């Protein structure tokens, strides 16, 4: 459990200058899930809603400096790991995880395969990511990445994917989230498969939209935040799945980019702000400027601070 009211969540991942994926999506997701987000950059990615243009990987020494800057100053409640780029970066992150307390939950989103099916990592780096799986609490591969991890064919339905995940969860001694969003089905259920073979499924319906850029980053970051807040795997996945479904529902309204746009990470707070303007309460901007114009309450204020509160409330104390 976090010591403060907000779990402090570190994202270790690449970037997205258009804000839909990578650390930019991570920070918004962490905030939406009730956490305080921090990030360490593994790779600078020139991408937008239409695709990736180029990737620049800073020296691993700079990655080390970023990690040291965080851990020297901030107590971490949860970690989310995204794009690792190469074997050297993966090894450095693995070393960093060994320095964390055992009760800090770590979520790995193994970015290994592009939506097109292209492999993003060299064979050595893929093996390093496989090894890293045994150091984390839970992994969130898409179906293509699950197939790469297990050296199997890509699953054609959720039940087949769950069976494959059971194999990897047992072998790597880590929980595996199976994501049904890429399946050709009216449902988009997720499931968490534990090393003991138990499965907890979370129902979700498919949303008819092309704007799903960064959904993997967003789900894993929200999941890490809820785990950092003390939720169980099942409770964290349930919250994150339902939140992400709503974010996808509201994605089209953002109108960001010409390709596959981002989801609306802050849809809940946006709706609250819009609703606030319709509440039946007085307009209070002038209350503090001219308190003498506000009716005095029937009971005299006990002091200046109480008087100030009554003035701000516009005398609506009943």
Q: PLM features: what roles do these ranges have?
A:
Residues 122-199, 208:
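Conserved phosphate/ATP/ADP-binding segment of small-molecule kinases
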Residues 12-18, 199-213:
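Short pre-catalytic strand/loop immediately N-terminal to key active-site residues, enriched for Gly-Thr
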Residues 2-11, 23, 31-115, 262-272:
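Conserved N-terminal subdomain of the carbohydrate kinase-like
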Residues 33-38, 198-200, 226-241:
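Phosphate-handling active-site elements
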Residues 6, 54-57, 235-317:
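Charged C-terminal helix
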Residues 19-35, 297-303, 307-312:
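N-terminal basic/disordered segments at the start of proteins
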Residues 24, 29, 147-148, 210-233:
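Short, small-residue alpha-helix embedded
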